[in-house]
């Protein structure tokens, strides 16, 4: 949300991040002679999302004080606002982008993000900083490259990325945003959890019916229910050089354990079916020999798989697993109808 501050000032200081029309604080005006401002304008025109480089949206004179000095009103981005509450327990500290080159690099990232994002998922506004810290310190800020406020999505550490990293980072942000929106829908989460509620954090051996899974987990460094998650047709980054491996190798000797690609695919298909009978598409993040620890871990795997594979490939891979597809349909309905995603 926007914080409003009223201060007395003797002179009008220029606000960094020019081009914000004060008659409409979020409207970006064009300046063909300024590459940064022109690109901000182009993004605003194409996606209707203003991009800011600092937390000051606008300032204007709203009157004078008793001494005839101007009283200024400042409107700033305030990440402490939530949908229905406000807390000032956290102080956010921005390190702004200082050069036109870094700003143009950041705008390249913003453009790719908006291109990949569904219209309903686009934020009201975007702010890009060089870095963002908080007092008290937050581990989640250090781990991520964005924070979502009530009306503003703030990106940081995105101004020096390669083209591949831009795509990967934008994708990961979208994955996380979708996962958070799913998490916020309590009814959806309850229905999702109910499908496999009896099977969380149990070994495949205890659950039973996973003989192929258990066999290959014991004798191969590659085959586990976690690595399986990235097998065909799953490919986390399209065109990635980290190609899918068909070389199932022995734990000790590294000897190949399958004759050819087709046998490898058959083994994978069998394991997909075995753990899919319990509604799972991969194992626990800490040990592939167990099912996911809880519904949240499980949901996040589904969100990533759905967004990566899309409807056709998800059905191709998991269509014969009834419980997996039951969860899929729950999430698909929400993603398509509420978030406007195209799967």
Per-range role (PLM):
Residues 1-3:
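Sec-dependent signal peptide recognition
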Residues 5-9:
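C-terminal motif of bacterial Sec signal peptides marking the signal peptidase cleavage site
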Residues 10-108, 317-343:
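Acidic/polar, low-complexity intrinsically disordered N-terminal segments immediately downstream
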Residues 95-152:
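Auxiliary, metal-adjacent structural segments of Zn-dependent hydrolase domains
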Residues 115, 175-179, 183, 336, ...:
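Sec-exported extracytoplasmic/periplasmic mature domains
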Residues 152-208:
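Active-site recognition of the HExxH zinc-binding catalytic motif
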Residues 192-282:
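Post-HExxH zinc-binding segment in Zn-dependent metallohydrolases
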Residues 241-243, 249-343:
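A cross-kingdom marker for long, charged
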């Amino acid at each position: 949300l926007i914080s409003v501050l009223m201060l007395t000032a003797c002179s009008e200081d220029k606000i960094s991040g020019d081009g914000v029309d004060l008659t409409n604080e979020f409207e970006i005006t064009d300046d063909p002679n300024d590459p940064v401002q022109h690109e901000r304008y182009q993004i605003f025109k194409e996606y209707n999302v203003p991009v800011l480089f600092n937390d000051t949206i606008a300032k204007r004179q709203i009157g004078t004080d008793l001494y005839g000095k101007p009283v200024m009103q400042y409107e700033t981005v305030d990440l402490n606002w939530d949908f229905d509450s406000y807390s000032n327990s956290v102080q956010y500290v921005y390190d702004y982008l200082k050069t036109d080159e870094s700003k143009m690099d950041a705008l390249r990232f913003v453009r790719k993000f908006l291109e990949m994002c569904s219209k309903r998922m686009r934020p009201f506004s975007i702010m890009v900083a060089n870095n963002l810290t908080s007092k008290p310190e937050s581990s989640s800020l250090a781990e991520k490259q964005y924070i979502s406020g009530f009306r503003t999505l703030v990106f940081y550490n995105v101004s020096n990325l390669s083209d591949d990293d831009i795509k990967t980072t934008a994708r990961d942000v979208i994955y996380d945003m979708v996962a958070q929106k799913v998490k916020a829908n309590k009814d959806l989460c309850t229905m999702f959890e109910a499908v496999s509620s009896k099977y969380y954090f149990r070994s495949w051996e205890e659950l039973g019916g996973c003989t192929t899974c258990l066999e290959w987990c014991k004798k191969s460094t590659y085959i586990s229910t976690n690595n399986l998650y990235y097998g065909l047709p799953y490919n986390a980054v399209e065109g990635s050089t980290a190609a899918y491996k068909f070389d199932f190798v022995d734990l000790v000797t590294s000897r190949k354990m399958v004759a050819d690609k087709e046998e490898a695919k058959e083994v994978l298909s069998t394991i997909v079916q075995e753990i899919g009978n319990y509604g799972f598409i991969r194992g626990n993040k800490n040990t592939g020999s167990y099912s996911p620890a809880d519904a949240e871990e499980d949901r996040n795997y589904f969100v990533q798989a759905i967004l990566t594979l899309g409807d056709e490939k998800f059905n191709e891979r998991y269509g014969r697993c009834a419980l997996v597809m039951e969860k899929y349909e729950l999430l698909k309905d929400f993603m398509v109808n509420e978030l406007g995603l195209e799967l």
